[in-house]
Curated annotation (Swiss-Prot):
Residues 62-125 form the bZIP domain. The gene is Cebpg. It comes from Mus musculus. Belongs to the bZIP family. C/EBP subfamily. There is a cross-link at residue 3 (Glycyl lysine isopeptide (Lys-Gly) (interchain with G-Cter in SUMO2)). This is CCAAT/enhancer-binding protein gamma. The lineage of its organism: Eukaryota, Metazoa, Chordata, Craniata, Vertebrata.
């Protein structure tokens, strides 16, 4: 059985160190690990492919730079238009909801008045029925029960 050797640390860029280890005797290959170089972890570990793009500044007169700027400007313009449209849609929805709220409040007032009128009619009718009903006395009931045929 073979043992792994001690990992070798290579100083990297952007505060990142790359740890290399030797492969097993079986021929398995290990992938280098990206770790922060400092004890504070001074940044995110970035793969080398991403690091190379950041390290070389682009010439402002190059075609690639102009194309990137143009694409970025178009994206910003599109984003701002989308944001404006969303704000307009929201404002329109707010106005629709306000109008609907006013209609509903008017309907509530109308229905409340109608309920009040109906309650008054009901109470008036109930009182008139109560006034028309004569109290039944015990004498009348006794007389009617003695003469069931009449």
């Amino acid at each position: 059985m073979s043992k792994l050797s001690q990992p070798a640390t290579t100083p990297g860029v952007n505060g990142i160190s790359v740890i290399h280890t030797q492969a097993h005797a079986s021929g398995l290959q290990q992938v280098p690990q990206l770790v922060p170089a400092g004890p504070g972890g001074g940044g995110k570990a970035v793969p080398p492919s991403k690091q190379s793009k950041k390290s070389s500044p682009m010439d402002r007169n190059s075609d690639e730079y102009r194309q990137r700027r143009e694409r970025n400007n178009m994206a910003v313009k599109k984003s701002r238009l989308k944001s404006k449209q969303k704000a307009q849609d929201t404002l329109q929805r707010v106005n629709q909801l306000k109008e609907e709220n006013e209609r509903l409040e008017a309907k509530i007032k109308l229905l409340t008045k109608e309920l009040s009128v109906l309650k008054d009619l009901f109470l008036e009718h109930a009182h008139s029925l109560a006034d028309n009903v004569q109290p039944i006395s015990t004498e009348t009931t006794a007389t009617n029960s003695d003469n069931p045929g009449q």
